[in-house]
A protein has these predicted regions:
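Pre-Walker A (Motif I) flank of P-loop NTPase domains
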Residues: 153-155, 246
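PAPS-dependent sulfotransferase catalytic domain
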Residues: 22, 26-29, 46, 187-218, ...
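Intrinsically disordered, low-complexity, charge-dense segments enriched in Lys/Arg
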Residues: 211-253
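Post-Walker A helix-loop "phosphate-sensing" segment adjacent to the P-loop in P-loop NTPases
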Residues: 175-183
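Short, hydrophobic/aromatic alpha-helical segments in well-folded domains
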Residues: 157, 168, 233, 260-263
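P-loop NTPase catalytic core of nucleic-acid-dependent motor ATPases
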Residues: 149-151
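Glycine-rich phosphate-binding P-loop
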Residues: 156-176
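PAPS-dependent sulfotransferases, especially Golgi type II membrane carbohydrate sulfotransferases
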Residues: 1-147, 315-337, 344-367, 372-467
């Protein structure tokens, strides 16, 4: 890079850091109580506006009760089980507030279609009109009240590396008559982050009582019960609010949730699982392009530093990056390392799950190139592997909806769309020159080498992959 380019990049970087520091230091105190709640309650809310240096950073911030400003007074719900059985089609699980010790559900504004957005968590946050907060101590009672209504539901959990076509698959599923899909409900990531922090602190010799650890996460049995109950509530909301009452539900989970995938299937033993992935260098480049708004100059500056990412969300990229196995890697803790470690760690988890629990992991394994080659054929094969009978030619299928899902950019209109397409615009492959070269490939192999001799590079393939 020439001196002017370097100067411009440094100026942009410093500006971003200043904005983030300002954002962090001007954050207003939370208007919500930070003490344990004994009774369920509802309260009208309006979404807060987030001020971020890059819009794409919103995808790194977990949903929380503090996303909203409370309006009016809260209303106590004396019999929350009966309330949810009657109005559960209106409220969807949003997050968990560990300080109030409640599961947070939201009711959207009238007429909002939360599943029309490529990311369910984002649609929930932007359209919330009211919250329902259920004490964790009462969650089992609420789940039991509706469990029989959704006992027949078939869950499908999609685990993935990110940037691999998983959003497209959820759009296709939602276009069918046989199943519905939810793209990245954030409550599972909230649980994953809490479990990760607990594990990391425990490795440093701290016991749960000294961590302020949520009691529900103090042992596997209660954690599994929490997951089961959350899924039950989500199933009830989705089935009862769906005009066709489709009872096969695909849950596309965020990347880090693979860390407790074994707990997910212990909570829901009948669930089917899918793993979707892509070449590690391609995943990293695609993420960088979206995050940095296609600026190669910023990529060159940021690849050796997390900068504002560390300030905004210090734990996100450390799910795998703080693994002691990577202690000998050059530039450990820097930006490119963290992204590479995220992919390598995810793939190692997937490989281990396949070997340890082949009955549960995975019923279908999809590589990005298969979708690029033939979306419809690959999707059809995935449905077959999951035991679902589906054909776009079957009576009752909306061929226009399916064609739209196949043709349009599934992330258009969101900040994670690397090409900044608007909703409804068609997808097209990126033909611009690559950011990742020989140096990145060699460094990627160095990161891979730390995990052993199984994953040798970014082009590693799992057994049974549809390519």
């Amino acid at each position: 890079m020439d001196v002017f380019t370097v100067a411009a990049a440094i100026a942009i970087t410093l500006s971003a850091v200043v904005i983030v520091v300002y954002f962090l230091h001007t954050t207003q105190p939370s208007p919500w109580s930070k003490t344990k709640q004994r009774l369920a309650y509802t309260r009208k809310v309006i979404p807060k506006k987030r001020k971020l240096p890059f819009k794409s950073l919103e995808h790194l911030i977990l949903n929380s009760l503090d996303d909203f400003l409370p309006m009016e007074e809260e209303t106590t719900v004396q019999d929350v089980a009966k309330f949810f059985a009657r109005r559960g089609n209106e409220f969807s699980v949003y997050s968990i507030d560990w300080e109030q010790d409640v599961v947070v559900l939201i009711r959207p504004v009238d007429g909002a279609d939360l599943k029309s957005n490529p990311f369910f968590r984002q649609a929930q946050r932007r359209n919330a009109a009211e919250v329902l907060c259920v004490p964790l101590e009462q969650l089992q009672e609420v789940a039991s009240a509706v469990a029989d209504e959704v006992a027949h539901v078939q869950e499908v959990f999609i685990f993935m590396t990110g940037r691999c076509g998983s959003t497209l698959v959820t759009r296709l599923v939602e276009a069918t008559s046989v199943a519905q899909a939810v793209s990245e409900p954030d409550v599972f990531s909230v649980i994953s982050m809490a479990l990760h922090r607990l594990k990391r602190s425990s490795q440093h010799g701290q016991t749960p009582s000294h961590l302020g650890c949520p009691a529900v996460l103090s042992n596997e049995e209660s954690t599994i019960a929490l997951l089961r109950n959350v899924v039950t509530l989500m199933n009830y909301t989705l089935v009862t609010s769906d005009p066709r009452h489709r009872d096969v539900i695909f849950y596309k989970l965020r990347v880090e949730t693979i860390l407790f995938a074994d707990l997910m299937v212990r909570a829901i033993p009948s669930a089917k699982t899918v793993f979707m992935y892509r070449n590690g260098l391609e995943v990293t480049e695609s993420f960088n392009r979206a995050l940095l708004q296609q600026s190669y100059v910023l990529y060159k500056v940021f690849r050796w530093g997390m900068v504002f990412l560390d300030l905004l969300h210090p734990d996100f990229f450390k799910y795998f990056g703080d693994d002691p196995r990577f202690s000998t890697v050059r530039q450990r803790g820097k930006g490119l390392f963290m992204l590479f470690a995220f992919w390598v760690g995810t793939m190692q988890c997937a490989a281990d799950l396949q070997k340890r629990q082949p009955r549960h992991f995975f019923h279908a394994v999809i590589y990005y190139s298969a979708l690029l080659s033939d979306k419809k054929k690959t999707f059809r094969l995935q449905m077959k592997k999951l035991g679902l009978k589906w054909s776009p030619e079957e009576p009752g299928e909306d061929t226009d909806k399916i064609k739209k899902a196949l043709d349009e950019d599934s992330q258009a209109g969101t900040s994670l769309c690397a090409s900044a397409r608007k909703p409804g615009e068609k997808w097209a492959p990126d033909v611009s020159s690559r950011w990742m070269g020989q140096w990145e490939r060699e460094y990627f192999r160095e990161v891979c080498h730390c995990t052993g001799n199984e994953i040798l590079g970014p082009d590693f393939l799992l057994p049974g992959t549809i390519v």
